[in-house]
């Protein structure tokens, strides 16, 4: 990340900020990525708002995730991401009736096909048990919800290279130790892996 001059036009400025934010996330420096986003007085770029929300989801900052969710869902109503996050927030806030209504409307959308989301939401609302074998390729929101719902992730789950996912997985108690260690191994290039947490995870793994 250089000290290059910020581009003059608003669009170029937003593009420049996105490059810096994405680079910080790639390096695992989520605190500085979040600080950079927080410096923006009025965020009118949906991609930056999604990054901000994903960082807060990864760090379990649910109060911040839910803070402006109704505003974002209204403003960017074509993107189902905001509607799913809002349903999650409604459940966290004990607004089950609102969540069920929003979920019914979401299911009617032709381009909605997130079966994992539906399974995990049902588990959150009705405490249904889920066969972890059916949960694959989870996005960040769905993975966060498995933690809240205490759904165990299978040991054979295949990790991707997303820094936000990796640094979240190694801290998740519902993920097998072996998989958490794998996430740490994949995250070694990241800047902010706490040594104490890493040692605790490695020490809790029984070598057979």
Language-model segment annotations:
Residues 23, 51-56, 89-90:
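Residue-level signature for tetratricopeptide repeat
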Residues 1-24:
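Post-signal-peptide, soluble extracytosolic/periplasmic N-terminal scaffold domains
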